[in-house]
Amino acid sequence: LFSNTFVTNDAEWAEIEGDGQVEGIIKFDNSSDAASSYMPGGYNGEYTVIEAYKLNGKKLWWINCGPNMTDFQNNETNIIAYDWDEDGKAECVLRGADGMVIHMADGTTQTIGDSTKNYRATGGSSGQFFVHEGSEFLIYMNGETGKPYQVLTYPLKRLEDGETDLEKAWGDGYGHRSTKHFFGAPYLDGKKPSIFLARGIYTRHKMIAYDVDPATHSLNVRWTWNCNNSSSPWYGEGYHNYGIADVDWDGRDEIVYGSMVIDDNGHGLSTTGLGHGDAQHCGDFNPYIHGQEIFNCNETQPINNYRDATTSKIYYRTTGSNDAGRAIAGNFSDDYPGAIGLSAYDSPISLVKNGHIDGMSSTGITENFRIYWDGDLNEESMDYTNGK
């Protein structure tokens, strides 16, 4: 039993048992740990945990993330689930660090890395705190049992060989820019899912794609990407999220990485060069033309842009001085053909006519999440956790 206040954070839903019902994989952040300034021993030795549950509440397995998987925003400890080996049961992928302990379904445990290592400051830390030292691991595990198939040195290194200065390498020295991680399951060949990893958004960024051998669960590198050239049009184009989409409709998925798109072969497909932003949406927003489109807000060069997802040709853009921060695109009304785009510091945009919609108010459309809620074919928007 836990003695502290654990707060539910992210949840992943997947079919990990093969019984026809989904299971939940839920991350719980230890708010007592944060309130006590992330002391080396945590709060009573407890840290962030990840737990897998059946719908009836039975716990299948759980992970004590340990002292070295901590950040003040609680968003860089991630786990994803997908059926990469195509056996009808999803597996899991996550990043690990020294001292993480996996408590498997059979009652046994596996410690990741060196359990004696603790990279938290002796007197604790406050403010914008990230653990940015020590070993990192890529864990590929059985989703039903929690037993790892592979525990590998994390391929997207915090510092490359020969690099010693975090600030020089990433642009800050406290771990914010080096501690941005993404995971996914794109169909890069159009037939089988690959494992995708990425690191970095503001400046440099690194990516790798693996193919899974279903028989051995070994991971084979499909391609890698590494951009650390500040004069490159690809540099600093990442967002706080990314997407997977077949933008050119060739049957193979691309990586939609903020202001740029990476082709299924790991080469750059197109980029706007507009830099970093916070929110992006990709889809067939204009059904009257071929291919998909992207609607983004912008921070480096505010405010937003609407563009061809394949070529990055900009159809419409609003400029200004404010970091928009949020944007949304969806088919919110039958009064207008196609989708509507909306960002902070702007009014609604027709993603068919490529211009602002005269007389339409943004009241009633929030800018965080799309959802189908009331049974019709129009989308609704959802904001926060209070049901707005």
Question: PLM features: residue spans?
Answer:
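Beta-propeller-forming repeat regions
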Residues: L1-K388
